């Protein structure tokens, strides 16, 4: 009798685990479980997917914070004119090709920005400009041969203090 009870409990446990693993598989994108048969591979795929999502969340939060910093000070400040009179705003972060520079410059000619980048040994590969709250937001991707040789803090200070 005791063996039958134990056997039945074990059978239910296996069925429940199979159901849970099937549910896990249904939640994961195919590229994270493709070709993986064992449950340990599926769990590892789930862990990788969670890590992937966490990195994406950090990247998106960082971009949101940068955009709020560059364009949304008027949300935090009651005096919008104060925001418009503030100096240039610069955010520099690593990207696949080197670094990404997001900046909002007031009266600085854009050619001066390009000159500073050239002086720091950066080669612009991509550029996007958009208008947010009547300010231009410039986003540049620059190739960097050796990131260790570039003083990002100095570059940020130089771009921020440009007139």
Swiss-Prot record:
Any one Gene Ontology MF annotation carried by this entry is: DNA-binding transcription factor activity, RNA polymerase II-specific
Q: Tell me the superkingdom of the source.
A: Eukaryota
Q: Which GO terms describe its biological process?
A: regulation of DNA-templated transcription; regulation of transcription by RNA polymerase II
The record describes its quaternary structure and partners as:
Homodimer.
What lineage, starting at the top, does this entry show? Answer: Eukaryota, Viridiplantae, Streptophyta, Embryophyta, Tracheophyta
Recorded hits in Gene3D superfamilies, A to Z, give: Helix-loop-helix DNA-binding domain
The record's listing under PANTHER family reads: ACHAETE-SCUTE TRANSCRIPTION FACTOR-RELATED, TRANSCRIPTION FACTOR BHLH118
- Pfam families of this UniProt entry? HLH
Q: Where does this polypeptide localize?
A: Nucleus
**Entry keyword set:** DNA-binding, Nucleus, Transcription, Transcription regulation
What's the source species for this entry? Arabidopsis thaliana (Mouse-ear cress)
Protein name (record) = Transcription factor bHLH118
**Chain ranges of the bHLH domain:** 1-53
User: An example Gene Ontology cellular component term from the record?
Assistant: RNA polymerase II transcription regulator complex
For whether the record's keyword set contains DNA-binding, the answer is yes
